[in-house]
């Protein structure tokens, strides 16, 4: 494997590790924060419904019940939240170590590039990563992880090496979801 190919491989691993770390942090954030926000919003709507008749409808009540069920779903993950945080921290460390290896390989002259040494270092880090992965993630963590990875993490080396575009940065499912909402809004406004 050439030095250029190794840089691509390390960047690809970096993307997977960094995204995995952010997905764990996304799940952790959703578990910790969303139940409180859902409860607060539901309570606020309930209080305002006491003196704003438009809020005291069956539709609003149904939405509040759905919020309550969503809170119950989120609570199923509560006992595991420390595991998500710990996995995110360990995977972030692996991501940072991969960046160091990437920059070392990039700054090494072609004639001095040691494939075997680099491959061993990368394999060791990837073993650490795989030992910390958690496959069961909460609903919505994938979208939130995209935001956390592309907006919060210093990952220019991954973006530059893999030549990531906006297509890679926005989840396809979110584009479909937005299109579905727009279509539903158009249908609702044309029917009424």
Task: Name every feature range the model reports, one short phrase each.
Residues 32-85, 162-192:
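Alpha-helical transmembrane segments and their immediate juxtamembrane boundary regions
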């Amino acid at each position: 494997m050439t030095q250029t190919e190794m840089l691509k491989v390390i960047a690809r691993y970096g993307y997977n590790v960094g995204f995995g770390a952010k997905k764990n942090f996304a799940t952790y954030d959703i578990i910790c924060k969303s139940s409180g926000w859902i409860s607060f919003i539901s309570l606020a709507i309930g209080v305002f419904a006491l003196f704003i008749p438009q809020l005291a409808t069956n539709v609003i009540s149904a939405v509040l019940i759905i919020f309550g069920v969503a809170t119950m779903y989120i609570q199923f993950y509560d006992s595991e939240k420390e595991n998500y945080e710990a996995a995110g921290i360990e995977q972030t460390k692996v991501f940072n170590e991969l960046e160091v290896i990437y920059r070392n390989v990039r700054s090494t002259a072609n004639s001095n590039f040691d494939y075997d040494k680099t491959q061993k270092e990368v394999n060791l880090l990837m073993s650490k990563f795989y030992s910390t992965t958690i496959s069961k993630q909460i609903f919505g963590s994938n979208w939130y992880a995209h935001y956390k990875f592309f907006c919060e993490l210093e990952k220019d080396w991954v973006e530059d090496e893999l030549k990531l575009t906006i297509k890679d940065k926005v989840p396809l499912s979110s584009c479909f979801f937005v299109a579905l909402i727009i279509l539903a809004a158009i249908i609702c406004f044309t029917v009424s």
